[in-house]
Amino acid sequence: MTKDELIARNRKFAIEVIMTIELLPSNRVYDALVRQLVRSSTSVGANYRAACRAKSTKDFINKLKIVEEEADESSYFLDLLREIDKGKNKEKLGSLLEESNQLVSIYVASLKTMREKLKISKN
């Protein structure tokens, strides 16, 4: 997957999260979880764009670690919302959870590759 494709995928993920949460009920519990989810899901793309502008491999790795953490946090809040949802949003929340988990896997693999490259370049 190219950098531009991943930027587009992150953007699509954030937009789908935002559109889905508009369908959820509003109460204290949902509102608290939704606020956290909006922050983490939109941070995935924003922080990936920042990582793409990194000054060095080490800087890229540090920024990409934040991206991975935000994607994982999004998975957590999507899982909670899917579990407590009593409406017809379980399927969509499950689909978003799957996408979030795939993004986590992509970033974990990318981090592993970059760390190996950094090790090789030091030797």
Regions found by a protein language model. Name each.
Residues M1-S43, N47-A50, A54-N123:
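Short, C-terminally biased terminal segments at protein or domain edges
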